[in-house]
């Protein structure tokens, strides 16, 4: 597994709007295996790490958008508290149309992870993805 650290950060509070769009909503359960909470947990990667999607091309899956809303690529992943006592399965979303740099990830899960894991901005987390 690939493992890397990041810090929880606040986003633009817009992901929930997109998560609720019918064009995406119908595909979440089939492709992610769960219905995601209607927002993302933003994670700023540590130590100038960026995720090179070219190296993970065979692991990426796609949620199809339409003319107004772009496709969303995703990787199945696991997010853990820094002490690794609690791990939650989810996915890292890579919207084709995004405002974030490659060092900020958008993580989704079936739960509101800020509440479930008692996370706040600046808290460190660990993300793991299959190689």
Curated annotation (Swiss-Prot):
Its EC number is 2.7.1.161. It comes from the Archaea. The keyword Glycosyltransferase does not apply. One of its GO terms (molecular function) is magnesium ion binding. Keywords: Flavoprotein, FMN, Kinase, Magnesium, Metal-binding, Nucleotide-binding, Transferase. Binds 1 Mg(2+) ion per subunit. Its cofactor is Mg(2+). FMN binds at residues 98, 106. CDP binds at residues 11-16, 111-114. InterPro entries: RibK_CTP-dep, Riboflavin_kinase_archaeal, Riboflavin_kinase_CTP-dep, Riboflavin_kinase_dom_sf. It catalyses: riboflavin + CTP = CDP + FMN + H(+). This is Riboflavin kinase. The lineage of its organism: Archaea, Methanobacteriati, Methanobacteriota, Methanomada group, Methanobacteria. The gene is ribK.
């Amino acid at each position: 597994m690939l493992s890397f650290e990041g810090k929880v950060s606040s986003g633009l509070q817009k992901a929930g709007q997109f998560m609720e769009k019918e064009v995406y909503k119908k595909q979440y359960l089939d492709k992610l295996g769960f219905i995601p909470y209607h927002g993302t947990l933003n994670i700023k990667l540590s130590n100038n790490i960026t995720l090179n999607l070219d190296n993970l091309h065979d692991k990426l899956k796609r949620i199809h958008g339409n003319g107004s809303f772009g496709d969303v690529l995703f990787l199945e992943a696991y997010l853990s508290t820094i002490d690794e006592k609690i791990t939650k399965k989810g996915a890292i979303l890579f919207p084709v149309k995004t405002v974030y740099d490659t060092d900020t990830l958008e993580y989704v899960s079936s739960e509101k992870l800020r509440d479930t894991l008692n996370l706040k901005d600046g808290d460190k987390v660990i993300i793991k993805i299959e190689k």
